[in-house]
Design a protein with these regions (language model features):
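A glycine-rich helix->loop->beta "capping" turn
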Residues: 5, 62-65, 85-98, 104, ...
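Active-site helix of classical SDR
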Residues: 131, 167, 175
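Residue(s) in the substrate-gating loop at a strand-loop-helix junction
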Residues: 151
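C-terminal helical subdomain
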Residues: 212-304
Length: 304
């Protein structure tokens, strides 16, 4: 018997890449799966129902149970329909994986309002809308699992991804809020920052040696490596794990730190700009975080 036997899981953006691998593994672990995918391009344009249908059919061919959904996570109504799909087909929902995403990379001073809004709405709004819709049912049944996808673009930083980084770090805060609001109902909420070669990653430009090197490393990492952690976090075995941020990089799993006070200074008479000029940098500089990008911080070769 699989670790998810009898559970119903909704996996957004599961027609391709990481989401597809999660949906397939959850089905093999016994879950009934709603395969949600709009079927759009990497930038979110267009739609194609065959993308979700192919994964649904693959699950059924292997003896599992699945339903396909083609709604967009980026609207309140779309998210409601995604969760309702689970209820219509399988009468409940136990697991929500917020995986759907798009990329519209652009350097800050060239990014358009549309490029900002599109990414924020898909990642951050989408994660909230779907979590909100699922939370109503989790509260009633006093159980549930929320698994969100963040990124080192938000946790650490990347050039040309102000929209994506903002959305992905916002998802960490959303996950923590979900964990706090729903802990009394036995609901957990965790984040995964994946490292894997997907069609979204393939769109990253390689205009300099550092970008090219990063892309070459990512090309060695399979989306399938991310699925086991998602399945574990969805299971009863992970009932005591909540509000954490994990990373998966090939055969390696990380636990990320979260913001906490690392140093403080005080003045009994109060601070002035002049006092801060004299004290703040000399006292705190050794604790400052460097301005690096994720590829500089996580620079060792992946364990393929």
């Amino acid at each position: 018997m699989g670790m998810l036997e009898g559970k119903v899981a909704v996996v957004t953006g599961s027609g391709r890449g990481i989401g597809r691998e999660i949906a397939l593994l959850m089905a093999r672990q016994g879950a009934k799966v709603v395969v949600n995918d709009l079927g759009g391009t990497e930038a979110g344009a267009g739609s194609d129902q065959k993308v979700a249908d192919q994964v649904k059919d693959e699950i059924k061919k292997a003896g599992g149970e699945a339903a396909a959904n083609y709604d967009s996570v980026s609207t309140w109504a779309g998210a409601e329909k995604i969760i309702q799909c689970a209820l219509d087909h399988f009468k409940r929902i136990d697991v929500l994986v917020n995986n759907a995403g798009i990329l519209r990379d652009r350097i800050l001073f060239k990014m358009s309002e549309e490029e900002w809004d599109g990414v924020i709405k898909t990642h951050l709004y989408g994660s909230f809308f779907c979590s909100r819709a699922a939370a109503v049912h989790f509260r009633e049944q006093k159980s549930g699992r929320l698994i969100h996808f963040t990124s080192t673009a938000g946790l650490i930083g990347n050039v040309g991804q102000a929209n994506y980084a903002s959305a992905k770090l916002g998802i960490v805060a959303l996950s923590r809020s979900c964990a706090l609001d729903l802990q009394r109902y036995n609901v957990t909420s965790n984040c995964i920052a994946p490292f894997a070669w997907t069609r979204l990653i393939a769109t990253i430009p390689t205009e300099d040696p550092a970008q090219k090197a990063k892309k070459e490393k990512l090309a060695k990492m399979s989306p399938a490596d991310v699925a086991p952690l998602a399945c574990f976090l969805a299971s009863d075995a992970a009932q005591n794990i909540t509000s954490q941020v994990f990373g998966v990089r090939a055969k390696e799993i990380f636990l990320f730190s979260q913001p906490r006070i690392v140093r403080s200074i005080h003045d009994s008479t109060g601070w002035t700009p002049e006092k801060l000029a004299a004290m703040l940098e000399p006292t705190m500089k050794s604790h400052f975080h460097p301005l690096d990008v994720s590829g500089q911080y996580i620079s060792w070769d992946p364990l393929i």
